[in-house]
Amino acid sequence: MASFSTNEFKAGLKVMYDGNPCAIIDNEFVKPGKGQAFNRVKLRNLRTGKVLEQTFKSGESLEGADVVDTEMNYLYNDGEFWHFMHPETFEQLQADANAMADAKQWLKENGNDLCTITLFNGVPLSVTAPNFVELEIVETDPGVRGDTSGGGGKPARLETGAVVRVPLFVQQNEVVRVDTRTGDYQTRVSQ
């Protein structure tokens, strides 16, 4: 695998640090008035999700992580693992709860949601849900006319169990588009 020097560090770069695959979140080059220049780097451990801050002297290098991002369709959850299938090779893969993190609240079974799965040595480290998903509202209060003093929103439970804030005019059994990155309601979807 390639080696990356401190002058090649940038956000999004995947490197090995202390035997763990990490992604660089932030990189700041510091040149003090006296002494050697260094890089102050924030790393996210791809296995645990923990963020650590580390300094590297100029000229130091880190080994690149053998991490691959692949697009796969979500199939189902068997209670312990979430199962995915590659759309072209039909190869199946299973991810555990640690790899799923927040993505599990946005995926419905056999919904053909195309997820990005980060693999390290063939093992899923993280699953990223599609940016937007369309889900049906299974439970919400009816919007009462004139009840808008608090901003005009109400909670709604989606078919996957996730709860989002929706406008008062949205009713139960309607399909809405949700931004999975923020968890915000975007629009109603006509069927």
UniProtKB/Swiss-Prot annotation:
Molecular functions per Gene Ontology: translation elongation factor activity
Post-translational modification comment from the UniProt entry: May be beta-lysylated on the epsilon-amino group of Lys-34 by the combined action of EpmA and EpmB, and then hydroxylated on the C5 position of the same residue by EpmC (if this protein is present). Lysylation is critical for the stimulatory effect of EF-P on peptide-bond formation. The lysylation moiety may extend toward the peptidyltransferase center and stabilize the terminal 3-CCA end of the tRNA. Hydroxylation of the C5 position on Lys-34 may allow additional potential stabilizing hydrogen-bond interactions with the P-tRNA.
Source organism, top-level taxon: Bacteria
GO biological process: peptide biosynthetic process
Coiled-coil zones: none
Keyword Glycosyltransferase: no
CDD domains per UniProt: S1_EF-P_repeat_1, S1_EF-P_repeat_2
Associated pathway: Protein biosynthesis; polypeptide chain elongation
The entry's keywords: Cytoplasm, Elongation factor, Hydroxylation, Protein biosynthesis
Residues with PTM N6-(3,6-diaminohexanoyl)-5-hydroxylysine: K34
Function: Involved in peptide bond synthesis. Alleviates ribosome stalling that occurs when 3 or more consecutive Pro residues or the sequence PPG is present in a protein, possibly by augmenting the peptidyl transferase activity of the ribosome. Modification of Lys-34 is required for alleviation.
Full protein name: Elongation factor P
Origin species: Psychrobacter sp. (strain PRwf-1)
Gene name for this UniProt entry: efp
